[in-house]
Amino acid sequence: MDPIILAEINGNIATVGYGLAAIGPGIGVGIVAGKTVEAMARQPEMAGSLRTTMFLGIAFSEALALIGLATYFIFTN
């Protein structure tokens, strides 16, 4: 095949791969935030501690998306 076509296919595959890699953290952040709100509704006095733990969970989940973004840039070049 033509090298230009192969480069285009490789770039498109990397784009789809990053999109798939971003789905997991998006779902994870939604679950973490939802469960934190449920826990705060049950025990309002623990809201500060729960909020801190929620932000840590979101940060770890978003780290996976950043790894996917780095992988995208590695495979497109």
UniProtKB/Swiss-Prot annotation:
The lineage of its organism: Bacteria, Bacillati, Actinomycetota, Actinomycetes, Micrococcales. Pfam families: ATP-synt_C (PF00137). One of its GO terms (molecular function) is lipid binding. It comes from Clavibacter michiganensis subsp. michiganensis (strain NCPPB 382). F-type ATPases have 2 components, F(1) - the catalytic core - and F(0) - the membrane proton channel. F(1) has five subunits: alpha(3), beta(3), gamma(1), delta(1), epsilon(1). F(0) has three main subunits: a(1), b(2) and c(10-14). The alpha and beta chains form an alternating ring which encloses part of the gamma chain. F(1) is attached to F(0) by a central stalk formed by the gamma and epsilon chains, while a peripheral stalk is formed by the delta and b chains. The keyword Membrane applies. Keywords: ATP synthesis, Cell membrane, CF(0), Hydrogen ion transport, Ion transport, Lipid-binding, Membrane, Transmembrane, Transmembrane helix, Transport. The gene is atpE. It is found in: Cell membrane. This is ATP synthase subunit c. The record marks 62 as: Reversibly protonated during proton transport.
